[in-house]
Amino acid sequence: KKNVGKMQKPAPDDLNNLLVYLRTKMTNQVKYDRNKDRQGLFKEDFFKTSYSENLQLLQEWIEESKSDSTIPSDALPQQLYLTMLTEYTAGFPIEEIKKRMNQIVYYCKQCLDIHRQYGQKEDIMFIWGPEEWAGEEQPNIIGLCLLFERMDWLETIKDSLNPYNDDEMYYDPSFRALMNMAIPTKFDPSAKFAKGGHNFRKPLLQAIMAESKEESLKYLNTYLSGWYEGNRKIGNLLIDTHLNQDPEYGGYIGYWSFESAAVAYLKDLDDTSLRQYLYYPKDMIDWARA
């Protein structure tokens, strides 16, 4: 269920900087360079139209949060995530992706404050959706926190996954194991994955838990080889969206497994074999290692 509440007024400098950034992006004609496209799947017209509309929507919601208007409290982090993925896919510099992540975490904190003030335990707000329904958002957000080495961000994301620190709440063991690589996170590595095909993430968990680099690399290759079809099996609506890039209906933002890169980064793996996969974010791990 979506929890609705009043956004607390953001710090003026943070808000004004974001608004200036959005207005600049919208004022200047949106440009697309296929040579920078990290997957090479965007159609130019679709990208320009969808990205401009996303920026316009963000500006409207940011303006609403500046006032005391009531908006869905999880709307901004989700929309910022979609915009960030679009920007990464289109080839935006990593430093801009980092700024966007900072905005996502900022509004996650706002959401948590709203929920703790107005929410009820039986009406938990899921900014990223319950873990038994999780697509790629949760592991991607966790993975990006790790690749940017921002444990403060990760603490906020961890709180947003389980606002009440409820041990009885379902969790995906691979997500918790991923967070535990950097910050103490309670989880049971033998916990079952959700029904409906979510056990395609078992090799990710095995890669994290493996004692040797060779084993970790083997499991990551297995995970990535089944990543796309695994997401299809669980009903991830992003899958195959590149095939229908209609600005009115299409939803392609890119396909990425930042969690895989985070494991390779933290375990200092030779990721040469992982770079064959279109959705392995090699630019991101190269930036982290620089």
Report each predicted region and the residues it spans.
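Alpha-helical oligomerization segments
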Residues: 214, 218, 224-290
